[in-house]
Amino acid sequence: MKLTDSVLRSFRVAKVFRENSDKINCFDFSSNGETVISSSDDDSIVLYDCQEGKPKRTLYSKKYGVDLIRYTHAANTVVYSSNKIDDTIRYLSLHDNKYIRYFPGHNKRVVALSMSPVDDTFISGSLDKTIRLWDLRSPNCQGLMHLQGKPVCSFDPEGLIFAAGVNSEMVKLYDLRSFDKGPFATFKLQYERTCEWTGLKFSNDGKLILVSTNGGTLRVLDAFKGAVLHSFGGYNNSKGVILEASFTPDSQFIMIGSEDGKIHVWNAESGMKVALLDGKHTGPVTCLQFNPKFMTFASACSNMAFWLPTIDD
């Protein structure tokens, strides 16, 4: 089944899970699409089975809190950042609920975490105005970059380069093998005083970069030239909430939730609005991602919703 405008418009909430007492701050699908794992401000980690459509287990990180949860390539392991006490990144085995390793270094809250798509490398960005490069096999930071402001960062789909959005006004591209030489490209965007950048993602085909903000606009950039191809607005975000925006796996569409529980979908190439879906969420849709392998997506406020198409194209 191929994603088309009409298939996207047909999506409806198939299941709602009420496992959390506070907002879900992040979730991540496994690369095979079979599970999704969430982190929440209630200090819990919930693992869901996407095929059976049910929660499998819940773990807790009471002392440090849990945010920015990401699967690693090893089965049943995740990395996540803390949202209280310290700013150490933790590497957890879900299998026995034990920490494998800690990654100390940041001295302010970690606001970005991206796992390499190809190996054990990951990068983190923090309010301490640094980006750090790590390897899961070592607690020591493998590289450090000092920046002029708050960073958001992400690997490209090949894992060869990473992009850093700095101070909500420029995107810098770094070669992973020689990042200490500085960026090989810098794209300066018009500075918007009304909002901050909160996320940065590449499309799976590597051609586009999506910049999300805590305001009412999203931007799509050409990943090679840095030109702004589209600015998307028209969704509600009056309170400056961090709303996750995502590409569909085929790189053709861009989705974002809103503070009123609705999901907005645009065509990434034409910039036309394709769908407006009502998730009936009780709060802002803080997290939204399409499953990498199956025709389903998930959205979350303090509840988690699984969506399915209602037509067979």
From Swiss-Prot:
Keywords: Chromosome, Cytoplasm, Nucleus, Repeat, Transcription, Transcription regulation, Transcription termination, WD repeat
Molecular-function GO terms, alphabetical: chromatin binding
Biological process (GO), any one: DNA-templated transcription termination
Pfam families, per the entry: WD40
Record-linked PROSITE patterns: WD_REPEATS_1, WD_REPEATS_2, WD_REPEATS_REGION
Transmembrane segments: none
GO cellular component labels: chromosome; PTW/PP1 phosphatase complex; Set1C/COMPASS complex
Subcellular location: Nucleus; Chromosome; Cytoplasm
Main location: nucleus
UniProt key word Flavoprotein: no
SUPFAM superfamilies: WD40 repeat-like
Role, per record: Regulatory component of the SET1/COMPASS complex implicated in the tethering of this complex to transcriptional start sites of active genes. Facilitates histone H3 'Lys-4' methylation (H3K4me) via recruitment of the SETD1A or SETD1B to the 'Ser-5' phosphorylated C-terminal domain (CTD) of RNA polymerase II large subunit (POLR2A). Component of the PNUTS-PP1 protein phosphatase complex, a protein phosphatase 1 (PP1) complex that promotes RNA polymerase II transcription pause-release, allowing transcription elongation.
Assembly: Component of the SET1/COMPASS complex. Component of the PNUTS-PP1 phosphatase complex.
PANTHER family assigned to the protein according to its UniProt record, in alphabetical order: WD REPEAT-CONTAINING PROTEIN 82, WD40 REPEAT PROTEIN SWD2
Similarity-based family: Belongs to the WD repeat SWD2 family.
Protein name stated in the entry: WD repeat-containing protein 82
Name of the encoding gene: wdr82
